[in-house]
Design a protein with these regions (language model features):
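Alpha-helical repeat scaffolds
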Residues: 14-16, 42-54, 76-90, 113-126, ...
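Structural motif corresponding to the intra-repeat A-B loop/turn of tetratricopeptide repeats
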Residues: 5, 39, 73, 111-113, ...
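Alpha-helical, heptad-rich or low-complexity scaffold/stalk segments
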Residues: 1-75, 90-92, 138, 142, ...
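Alpha-helical adaptor scaffolds
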Residues: 293, 399-457
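Solenoidal tandem-repeat scaffolds enriched in leucines and small polar residues
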Residues: 107-148, 152-153, 163-165, 169, ...
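Generic helix N-cap/helix-start motif at coil->alpha-helix transitions
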Residues: 7, 22-29, 44, 56-65, ...
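Terminal, low-structured helical/coil segments at or just beyond the last alpha-helical repeat
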Residues: 211, 463, 475-516
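Residue-level recognition of tetratricopeptide repeat
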Residues: 34, 68, 102, 106, ...
Length: 516
């Protein structure tokens, strides 16, 4: 029952009790291993993996847990033997391409073998992604060949997210070893590299030894599975958990583990990982921001804002951070929170064409606050500013036009804007609804109904669309279909809409109950 409900801690406790009664049960130990990986109980995971291995059940997850244990103990011979197990026997043959080259190279570093980077020759790169070669530069440095490490790093690009993360760890490792010139040169390259700014917001530590190097690689693999459409949730969790057991101070690994837990529907576990990562991480850190996003997703918006807002109350100047925080802050009960974020972002972005869409979205967000407070006169100039910033953006045109239509203000201009929005994005159900409803409120019901029907097919559970369609049907004399649409809307309506729908279902459509 606990496994089915997603309560991994309760499931693990129950399985431990069963295992005491039936210690030789391979099936129970397999389930114990799975739940221990979710919870993060390395001791229980290792016990289960050992029993499975001894029973001849050489599962891939058991093999990875035993590899982590061997690396932590410094038993490099055992670690090497686990890496070199025939992949066909463990039920998952990922070793040849993903795991063994890097792990064997790090094992050679620890065992002081010659030329550990030789293992990476058959790895190379994956397309334009040079992450394995960046790993190779780090291995060369820890193997004592500083010049080769510098030379290899100078030839590599920083086009991929994981390449930038590994390069940042290499720069930190150069710095830790007193090689300021190499560290500074690499840091300069990173500062000018593309990306979402994650590396700059994380305090990336150096790689001190083979254990951390292997842990870092496993975290990178887990992150890759988490971000690949259709990627394996189980492998993402297995690799990120193993990576954190080996390299618990790696902030990138902490972020990757949290995402793997979210994918496994273990949001409480992800929140706990992020809370630990945020401790002492400073203002504008990605741990607090991601934690806030998860809290907001389950309705704890004000708690989310408090979590992400820096203790000083001073917002950072990181555009990527502010853009994500704005999506949380706009839902806060206190509109001043959202206003502060929007204003900080507006002050940071330029008037150039590339920033027009973001500027338009921010003006829309500021206007939306005033609209919800009944301050339409103050919202109007903000809406016009949004159109000036994004004159051809369908979403902006639709919001501005529909907002005016709701208030029956300057209907010809409002209708023209919604029509322009629909021409720009005719597949958008919300915009299609806006145009259909615009025709209805301007008296062209026959033209509006087909558009509203199309919108309802696109978003059949949308209360606003179904109410609009019901009203249009009633105006067309299609009373049975109108009530059907109103009932569909009532299933998901908010409190304000529910009363209006109840009145229509009881007595039909009137001017007083017409949708806004």
């Amino acid at each position: 029952m606990a496994e089915e409900s997603g309560d991994a801690s309760a499931a693990l406790a129950a399985l431990i009790a069963v295992a005491h009664a039936d210690p030789a049960s391979v099936g129970v130990r397999g389930r114990m291993l799975e739940q221990a990986l979710i919870v993060g109980d390395q001791r229980r995971a290792t016990e289960a993996a050992q029993l499975l291995w001894q029973a001849g059940e050489q599962r891939f997850d058991a093999r990875m847990v035993l590899l982590v244990d061997a690396v932590q103990r410094g038993d490099w011979a055992d670690a090497r033997s686990l890496v070199q197990v025939d992949g066909a026997k463990t039920g998952l043959d990922l070793t040849g391409r993903l795991i063994s080259p890097v792990v064997l190279a790090w094992i050679d570093v620890a065992a002081r073998e010659r030329d550990p980077a030789r293992h990476l020759v058959r790895f190379g790169r994956i397309g334009d992604d040079q992450t394995p070669l960046w790993i190779g530069a780090t291995i060369l440095l820890l193997a004592g060949d500083r010049n080769a490490a510098v030379g290899q790093a100078e030839t590599l690009n920083l086009n991929h997210r994981t390449s930038r993360v590994v390069a940042a760890r290499l720069a930190a490792t150069f710095a830790k070893r007193g090689d300021g010139a190499a560290a500074s040169a690499l840091a300069t390259r990173l500062a000018g590299a593309p990306g979402d700014g994650l590396v700059a917001r994380l305090s990336i530590p150096p790689v001190a030894d083979a254990r951390q190097g292997i842990g870092h690689w496993l975290a990178l693999l887990g992150d890759g599975f988490a971000r690949t459409p259709g990627g394996s949730n189980e492998l993402s969790l297995l690799f990120t958990r193993a990576g954190q057991w080996l390299d618990p101070a790696d902030p990138f690994g902490q972020i990757a583990l949290a995402e793997a837990l979210v994918q496994a529907k273990q949001v409480d576990g992800a929140l706990a990982v992020l809370e630990r990562g945020a401790a002492g991480a400073g203002a504008g850190n990605p741990f607090a921001l991601r934690r806030a996003e998860l809290l907001a997703e389950r309705g704890e918006v004000d708690h989310a804002v408090a979590v992400a807002m820096p203790a000083s109350g001073v917002l950072p100047t990181d555009r990527a951070w502010l853009t994500r925080f704005a999506d949380v802050a706009r839902r806060a009960k206190d509109p001043a929170v959202g206003e502060a974020v929007f204003d900080r972002l507006l002050a940071l972005i330029n008037d150039g064409e590339d920033d027009g869409e973001l500027r338009a979205a921010l003006f829309i967000a500021k206007a939306d606050i005033r609209i919800k407070q009944g301050r339409w006169a103050e919202a109007r100039p903000l809406l016009e500013a949004a159109l000036a910033a994004g004159p051809n953006d369908p979403g902006t045109l639709n919001f501005v036009g529909y907002s005016a239509l709701e208030r029956r203000e300057n209907i010809p201009l409002a209708l023209a804007r919604v029509e322009a929005a629909w021409l720009g994005d005719p597949a958008n159900a919300a915009i299609t609804d806006s145009l259909g409803w615009a025709y209805v409120v301007t008296g062209d019901v026959a033209r509006g109904v087909p558009l509203l029907e199309r919108a309802a097919r696109g978003e059949p559970a949308n209360a606003v669309i179904n109410e609009h369609l019901g009203d249009a049907y009633w105006k067309s004399g299609r009373f049975i279909e109108a009530r059907y649409s109103w009932r569909a809307a009532a299933l998901v309506a908010d409190d304000a809409m529910a009363g209006r729908l109840a009145a229509k279902l009881a007595g039909g459509l009137t001017e007083a109950t017409l949708a806004p």
